[in-house]
Amino acid sequence: MVVVTEEIVNGLKETLTDVSQPIAKRFRSLFTLRNLNGPLCIDAMASALNDKSALLRHEIAYCLGQMEDEYALKVLIDLVKNSDEHPMVRHEAAEALGAIGSESAHKTLKEYSNDPVREVSETCQLALSRVEWYEKNKPETEEDKMYMSVDPAPPLKKGSVSRDELRSKFLDSNLDIFNRYRALFSLRDIGDEQSVLALCDGLKDQSSALLRHEVAFVLGQLQHRVAIDPLTTCVLDESENAMVRHEAAEALGAIASTETIPLLEKLLQDKEPIVSESCAVALDVTEYFNNTESFQYADGIKILLEKNLVDQQQK
């Protein structure tokens, strides 16, 4: 067990905020701070929210939500309210407020559920529905959960709906976003090839970029090779929302098939920074999953110790 000290947090913060470092290395420090948890780590993460990388800022917001700590509420509320911020970052901050589930975020979520930016308004609606659902229902136990992520909507009760019915609900553009998400996560939890193919159909859904981006994220969690071609088509589509292409790129990295490496390397030159940076992170993840010597992806402390050793040797 790692004792969280100011020295460790400051070292990770230094890497996180160092614009000269590769984006993938900065992400590793971010994930390490998320895993260590606590106010010191939240402050360190928040200190990088003025970075020019929208991808990094959005990932910080995501991590703050996954920590489920009310200490991060003010930072997240400010992000949602900032109309000059990138929509992807505002969306992630709103989703994080839903993940934390505090009543003090209700006012902001309700106010911005009519935001002119659709990704923001839909996420606020989704987050409100999540908070209201958990006010009336017991959360899943850790034993019941198949994935450790704090999801923006709970799956439906296991066995209560057939796979075909779930697919129908998931693809029904007339259904509200919360219930479509519930069907999405139910398909994820089934996790067989037919469910993965049903999810891949969602990448072609034109009713919601928010839904498509969540599909890509979930396909990364599932790591099923049958999703490689649909994800490849998605990330290559320059007309697609950058938020969706980003998730598709990182999903390909999570699947960690060496056949996707040339594609990801090519897209390092993509004109959309969110996509090119996502491909750099995806390649780092692919390398990790294909390197049996690696133990933990969020290895910021290991990197920090190695840096300190080098510094000492140079003195």
Curated annotation (Swiss-Prot):
Q: What class of enzyme is it?
A: oxidoreductase
**What's a Pfam family this protein contains?**
HEAT_2
For this protein, what reaction is catalysed?
[eIF5A protein]-deoxyhypusine + AH2 + O2 = [eIF5A protein]-hypusine + A + H2O
> Could you give a GO molecular-function term held by this entry?
deoxyhypusine monooxygenase activity
Where do the HEAT-like PBS-type repeat units fall? 23-52, 56-82, 89-115, 179-205, 211-237, 244-270
Family, according to the entry, reads as follows:
Belongs to the deoxyhypusine hydroxylase family.
Q: What is this protein called?
A: Deoxyhypusine hydroxylase
